[in-house]
Amino acid sequence: MNQTLIQEILEVVEQAAIASAKLTGLGQKDEADAAAVEAMRLRMGKIEMKGKIVIGEGERDEAPMLYIGEEVGSGNGPGVDFAVDPCEGTNLCANNQRGSMAVLAASDTGGLFNAPDFYMNKLAAPPAAKGKVDIRNSATENLKILSDCLGLSIDELTVVVMDRTRHKDLIKEIRGCGAKVQPISDGDVQAAIACGFAGTGTHCLMGIGAAPEGVISAAAMRALGGHFQGQLVYDPAIAQTSEWADYTKEGNIKRLNEMGITDIDKIYEANELASGENVVFAGSGITDGLLFDGVKFERDCVRTSSLVISTLDSTARFTNTVHIKDGAKSISL
C-alpha cells in the first residue's frame, strides 16, 4: 500500500458520496444506497490492485455488487482487503439528516476481521483512555476512568448511544452518573471516530450496533491511537431487534461456529479487528456531520469533504475537494 493507492481510495468514497447525495432528502434510502454502491464499485475497478471485499453489502446471493468475496480492481498490483459501507446512515441520507457518509476501511490482504452480519457491543474512547477503560466494566466505572484520563468532571462528559430500546438501562445509568447522553438514530461510525479527536464534544461511544461497521470504526481508531473494543452479540434477547424475530440464541451460535468463530464471547481490540500492517480509513460526507460537511452542489462544481486516516504515515487528513464540471466558468473559494 502506498500514497498513490490511498489517494485513489479517497476518490472511491468521494464518488460514492456524490452519487448518494443526489438523492438526499427524497425518502429513497434503497436508491441512495444503490447509487453509492455502483459509484464505489466503478471507481474501485479503475485501481491497479488485487482488491477483495471482506465486508460489504451481503453475501453473493444477496447483493449484486460489493458482495462479500467480490474481487475489485484491475487484478494487478498489491492485495487489498476492503470493509465498505457506501452509504452509512441510509435513513439519514433519505431524510436529509446529519451524519450520513460513504466509508470504508482498507488493509493488506488478511488485515481485516471478516465480521459476520451480527450485532456488536462497542466501546470507543479517546487516545488518553486507551487501555484504561474496558468494555467489561460498567458504564459507571468507565465514566470515572474517562473523567480521570481527560481531566474533566463526569458532568462534562458526553456519551453517544444508539437510540434503541435495548439501551434503555444503559442510558439511565449514564445519566444517573451525571454524564450527558447524545442519542443517535443511525450511523455510529462517525460517532466512534469523533471520540478520537479532541474538540468534537464527543468523549465516548457505548452500546450495541452493527458488527461490520465496528470493523470500520476499529480501523479508524487504531490509526488514530484511540480506544476501541467490540464483542459480538448473538442473543436476540439482548439485541432486541425485529431483524432477529425468527432467530434463536442457539441458532446464532451455530452460525458463528460455522463461520469459524468458536470463542463467541471474545472481546476484540482494535488491532485484532484491523490487524494489517497498513490500515486506512476513508470517509466522505453525504450530509453534514460532526467531522465534515456533506456534498455541496454548485453551478460549476461539486464540493466534497472527507477524512483519510492512515497507519502508513500516522496521519489524519481532512480534505476539501472541488470537482469541476465541464465548461465551468467560475469557481468560488
From Swiss-Prot:
Keywords for this protein: Calvin cycle, Carbohydrate metabolism, Hydrolase, Manganese, Metal-binding
Pfam families per the UniProt record, alphabetical: FBPase_glpX (PF03320)
Entry protein name: D-fructose 1,6-bisphosphatase class 2/sedoheptulose 1,7-bisphosphatase
The keyword Hydrolase is annotated on this UniProt entry: yes
GO terms classed as biological process: fructose 1,6-bisphosphate metabolic process; gluconeogenesis; glycerol metabolic process; reductive pentose-phosphate cycle
UniProt similarity note: Belongs to the FBPase class 2 family.
Origin species: Prochlorococcus marinus (strain MIT 9301)
Protein task: Catalyzes the hydrolysis of fructose 1,6-bisphosphate (Fru 1,6-P2) and sedoheptulose 1,7-bisphosphate (Sed 1,7-P2) to fructose 6-phosphate and sedoheptulose 7-phosphate, respectively.
Oligomer and partners: Homotetramer.
MF annotations from Gene Ontology: fructose 1,6-bisphosphate 1-phosphatase activity; metal ion binding; sedoheptulose-bisphosphatase activity
Cofactor field: Mn(2+)
Annotated pathway: Carbohydrate biosynthesis; Calvin cycle
Signal sequence region: none
Binding site for Mn(2+) 1: D33, E57
Catalytic activity: beta-D-fructose 1,6-bisphosphate + H2O = beta-D-fructose 6-phosphate + phosphate; D-sedoheptulose 1,7-bisphosphate + H2O = D-sedoheptulose 7-phosphate + phosphate
Gene Ontology cellular-component annotations: cytosol
Highest taxon in the source lineage: Bacteria
Residues given in the record as Mn(2+) 2 binding sites: D85, E88, E213
KW Transferase (keyword) present: no
